[in-house]
Design a protein with these regions (language model features):
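Hydrophobic residues in beta-strands and at strand termini
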Residues: 9, 38, 72-74
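Generic cytosolic/nucleocytoplasmic N-terminal low-complexity/intrinsically disordered segments
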Residues: 1-4, 40, 73
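Intrinsic-disorder/low-complexity, polar/charged segments enriched in Ser/Thr/Lys/Arg/Asp/Glu/Gln
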Residues: 6, 31-35, 67-69
């Protein structure tokens, strides 16, 4: 997986992780991967719905020590 950018959204409450992710995904090229770090449990559903609506692909999502990690490939 070729991660070109990492967004640290830890400690932010909904909707800020999505707002910042929208902005960050706009700075990368189609096919590139954005890594997003978040602690808001609502992000699990939010990112899934957001990626689907934008045509982006969540390649992987994991949780380590309370930190959710999303790897999103831009459409």
């Amino acid at each position: 997986m070729n991660i070109v950018k990492t967004l640290d959204a830890k400690g932010l409450a909904c909707p800020m992780p999505i707002v910042r992710t929208k902005k960050a995904i706009g700075t990368i090229q189609s096919g590139e991967v954005l890594e997003v770090l978040a602690t808001d449990k609502g992000a699990l559903n939010d990112f899934s719905a957001w990626a689907k609506s934008g045509g982006h692909t969540i390649l992987e999502q994991t949780e380590e020590s309370g930190v959710l990690k999303f790897y999103i490939q831009k459409a």
